[in-house]
Every structure is written in structure tokens, then in C-alpha cells.
């Protein structure tokens, strides 16, 4: 059946941020995004939770807002005409599955928009349409399964957030030292820094030796899913001096990932692109993993050092001169390296639990999300 056969589609009421600021209250305002635009002192919708964004960057997004709320003029209500034929929660999950089809109905000339007349012709599959009772039972079971996966994913995500906070707390505690037990040194005192090579984009290959670019630095590791390659014979320079090995600590020097740290964990050698830097401890007096965790704690300060703003750009000179690292028991090298190793080992365990794609919670969340999408695909 078409969406217009089973639902009524209407536009909400005009609203803006000034109106919300002037009339603060408890009712969420759902307008051009999945999250509330704000909270206001009046509502115009009750127990009509499904909506679809009609204009703006989030056009075509399916929204769910239970209870009383204010629906804005950039959100279509999708109200079921006969609840004895179609379950609200089933329809919500189905519309999520049909998101690509909804996006295809949108226009993107100027301000992105979704015309209600186009949306109304969207085809909606209803199980066992000739047996309403059986149909509702099937819909209810499908919605129950998908809701269970949604809830589990939310719980895992909350757990992951808590673990990250735990890691940050212990990291900050472990990197705090009593006066006299620590000597603060510049990164330049204890590290060398290697800038990347200007590989030419017109010489990128589909195979060959991998290049690590700033977009590969993800804030803890190096994501090699989207990698460009090169052939050394295309360059007269000695590209071997830009090699990266497993365990090397990298930093993005410009762009959207400026200041993000990544530890390269691959058995295959890769190569530094321009605006990617590599930290090289000057001696065994500095534990590499200790350095890694310290740098993670300084990403905000490093970003500020880069100037922030729309086009942050980090200077290696400023980085190595202005960021100070605490060296415990600096006058006793044996005691210092032992303490650095102890701290790094504790943080490595927490880091693995929090971030590892094979051992930690992100992998569990990914699996549950795939299960959810698999079951949701069955209703499309």
C-alpha cells in the first residue's frame, strides 16, 4: 500500500529559536533534525511520535518523539489512520529501512526539500494484509525484536561512554605527580619529530606501498580502510626515510583531524604523507606507550596550539617547544622507565577494553547494529 493509504501526512507549526528562547518550557521541539531544537512551554502533538524532516540538511530523516511535544513546520507528521491495521512502532522501523527510498524523493537544488506529495506515494509492505489480526501479531513481533536490538545498542553505547570517561579519569590521575617526583620537559627534549612527504595525488595508485594521510588518523589509531598507494619509482627522492612501522605514534597536523593522535598498528610498513607527523623517542628513557597516552591527554591543548577555527594548522616547532611532558623520577633512569611502563600498562588495558575493535565494546556495538540492520532488512 502507499503511505497515503495508511497514514495522514501533515506539516507542523512555524517555530524558531527566538520563539523557543522567549517561551522556555518542558516540551521538546522537533523540527529539522532528530534531536530537539529546544524546549518550549506549549505542545501541539500528543502520542503521534513518527515524523519525517521536510527541509534542511537533515531532510528525509525519520524521527521518533513519544508523548507531548511541539512539531515544527520542517517536520511532517506521519499519523496512522487505522491502528488496527498498522502498528506505529512497526511503521517507524519500516520507514528507517526505507530511508534510501525517502532520500531519493528529496530535491537538493538550493535548500534540500521533501515534497509531501512525493512522500505519500511511498510503497509500504504490510504482512498478511488480508488477515489484520495476524498482521498485527507479526508487526508486533518484528517491532519487539528490533526494539530489543535498539535498546541493547543504546546500553552498549552508554557503557562505552562510561568506559571512556573511566579511561580519561585514570589517565589524568596517573599522569599527575607529586612535586619533586617529576621533571617537566618539552617534547623536543625527549623526542625527535618527522614530517611527512608530499606525495602527489595524481600519482596515487590502487596498489603498491600504502600512504597514511591526515584523514587516516582517528584519535587513537590509524584507520587503513581508505588508503592510497604509491610506486617508489615515481619519485627521485628517498621515500624510504618516511616509512612508518608498527607502534609508531602519529599526529595529524592540519584539516578536520588536526591534533588527533594515532598509533600505527600494522605489520605492513606504510609511509607518511605531508601534514602527518611522527614522534620518535630520542632514547629508551622515554617509554613509547607512555608518550602515546600522554599525547592523547593533550589533544585539546594541541588543537588550541594549532589555532582552532575552520582551518587549524599545527606547527611542528610550536608543538615540540610548547607542549610539556612529565618525566617521573627523571634523575633515576631505571626507576623512571619502570614507572612509565607501569602507567602505560594500566592505560593500555583500559584502552584495549574501550577502543579495540576486536576485544572491546565498539566491536560488540558494531555486531549488534549489524544484527539490527539484518532483521530490519527483512521487513523492507
Task: List where the protein language model places each region.
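Non-catalytic DNA-recognition/assembly elements of restriction-modification systems
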Residues: 1-13, 19-30, 176-196, 364
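Amphipathic alpha-helical coiled-coil/heptad-repeat segments
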Residues: 1-2, 127-186, 328-380
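Short, structured motif recognition centered on aromatic/hydrophobic residues
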Residues: 3-7, 27, 75, 88, ...
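A short beta-sheet element
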Residues: 31-99, 108, 115, 240-242, ...
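A short glycine-rich beta-alpha junction/loop motif
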Residues: 69-75, 110-129, 270-277, 310-331
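Short, basic/aromatic beta-hairpin or loop at an interaction surface
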Residues: 216-230
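Short alpha-helix capping/helix-loop boundary micro-motifs
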Residues: 233-239
